[in-house]
Swiss-Prot record:
GO cellular component: cytoplasm
Catalysed reaction, written as an equation: shikimate + ATP = 3-phosphoshikimate + ADP + H(+)
Main subcellular location: cytoplasm
EC numbers on record: 2.7.1.71
Family to which this protein belongs: Belongs to the GHMP kinase family. Archaeal shikimate kinase subfamily.
GO molecular function terms listed in the Swiss-Prot or TrEMBL record: ATP binding; shikimate kinase activity
Gene: aroK
The protein, known as: Shikimate kinase
Keywords: Amino-acid biosynthesis, Aromatic amino acid biosynthesis, ATP-binding, Cytoplasm, Kinase, Nucleotide-binding, Transferase
Length: 288
């Protein structure tokens, strides 16, 4: 039995570490998963150079959800930089969950699939809050606002914008964050949450970026440069090191130019409003 799925990366509007409320939007960088199930002993991951604990746990969790006992192998291919703050773990988890469901020939509610991936991420130790907001953005597309403690989707909108991403050379894993330092700023995070609920996503992400740059001792300079170049909003994505800016055709070029002096990799993308897709083997078919 073989199944495929493709899910998307995401960028931050509000990081949920401070107050368990989160917001994020899908971006047009993809992760595809292939799951092959058989009667062998246990599930193994096969992704060169990447820890496969998370995706293996996702497959095992789906099998448990349907009360089935199979072994097999799970593989992923991705366009999303790892440990950058662009939700590579959420995309991998979502793709692995849906590919397993596809292999089984079953159906599953999208939010139930998200929750399976979130539990797997917590078990694998790759997240502080469960990253329910990131997982919803990756799975559902558009921009979402969530209560990560209750694992409840509060709001979803479509958001039509181009995105510029700055990915510094370093990597940073969410499990290494100073949680107490972030939670000391929860009152400001509450204000960002209200902005997101009211639909001011660009303003919310900018304030979020300034807040978390302070908490995580990261430079706000990319945010300031992006705003000066005409971006509608800019932020540190997740716990970094990546930054994201919402732009149009004109300001996108200007943000790229402004960021070009900072080093690192710059990617042009777009907000992804489509949901993750079961049965889609995009990156395997494209040979990426």
């Amino acid at each position: 039995m073989r199944g495929y799925a493709t899910a998307y990366g995401a960028a931050t509007v509000l990081n949920a570490i401070a107050n368990w409320k989160g917001s994020a939007f899908g971006i047009s960088l993809r992760t595809s998963a292939e799951v092959v199930l058989d009667d062998s002993e246990g599930v193994r991951g096969d992704v060169e150079g990447i820890d496969t604990t998370l995706i293996v746990r996702c497959v095992e969790s789906v099998l448990s959800h349907f009360d089935l006992d199979y072994g097999g192998v799970v593989r992923t291919r991705s366009e999303i930089p790892v440990a950058s703050g662009l939700k590579s773990s959420s995309a991998a988890a979502n793709a692995a969950v849906l590919a397993t469901v596809d292999a089984l020939g079953e159906e599953i509610d999208m939010i139930d699939a998200v929750r399976i991936g979130v539990e797997a991420a917590l078990d694998a130790g790759v997240t502080v809050t469960g990253a329910f907001d990131d997982a919803c953005a990756s799975m559902l597309g558009g921009v979402v606002v969530t209560d990560n403690l209750k694992r409840c989707l509060l709001k979803r909108d479509e958001l039509h914008s181009d995105v510029v991403l700055l990915i510094p050379e370093e990597q940073f894993f969410s499990r290494d964050v100073d949680v107490e330092r972030c939670r000391a700023l929860s009152r400001v995070a509450d204000a960002v949450f209200e902005m997101a609920i009211e639909g001011d996503y660009a303003g919310a992400m900018t304030l979020n970026g300034l807040l978390y740059c302070t908490a995580l001792r990261r430079s706000p300079e990319p945010i300031v440069l992006a705003l000066r170049a005409g971006a509608a909003g800019a932020t540190l994505s997740g716990t970094g090191p990546a930054y994201a800016a919402l732009v149009d055709d004109i300001s996108g070029d200007d943000v790229v130019e402004a960021w070009s002096s900072l080093g690192g990799r710059i990617i042009r993308a777009a907000v992804e409003n489509r949901s993750a897709r079961m049965g889609q083997a995009d990156l395997f078919q494209e040979g990426i």
